[in-house]
A protein has these predicted regions:
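Helical hydrophobic small-molecule/effector-binding pocket
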Residues: 1-12
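Hydrophobic/aromatic-rich alpha-helical bundle segments in the mid-to-C-terminal region
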Residues: 10, 39-92, 99-101
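Hydrophobic core segments within long, regular secondary-structure runs in both alpha-
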Residues: 25-28, 32, 85-93
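General N-terminal targeting signals
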Residues: 24-28, 81, 98
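Amphipathic alpha-helical packing segments from all-alpha helical-bundle domains
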Residues: 3, 17-44, 55-62
Length: 102
């Protein structure tokens, strides 16, 4: 994405009033669905809903994609992008590990 970050910035941060203005929301909604499905496979459907609410799941996923998006826009090099992406992923994965193993 780094080589196309100008397009990504337009898509995510500057698409108000276009058919793409809800792109990030769509991406987060897709992540919500796949994460909930994974939790259902791990814990069973009933327990998955007790592990984390849909609202909390959405907020955490939105924070993750927002952090990645900010990183794409602000990174000064591919190396910086990769290093910061690693930090973001490690941070969020540590939290998700708790919910995968409850």
């Amino acid at each position: 994405l780094y080589s196309h970050r100008d397009i990504y910035e337009l898509l995510v941060f500057r698409s108000y009033g276009t058919p793409y203005e809800h792109f990030l929301d769509w991406l987060v909604d897709e992540e919500d669905r796949t994460t909930l499905r994974a939790l259902e496979l791990i814990h069973g459907a009933e327990k998955a809903r007790a592990v984390i609410s849909k609202e909390s799941l959405h907020i955490v996923n939105h924070a993750f994609y927002s952090a990645l998006s900010e990183n794409i826009i602000h990174a000064k090099s591919v190396e910086e992008l990769n290093a910061t992406t690693e930090v973001i992923s490690t941070f969020f994965n540590a939290g998700w590990e708790k919910y995968r193993t409850l």
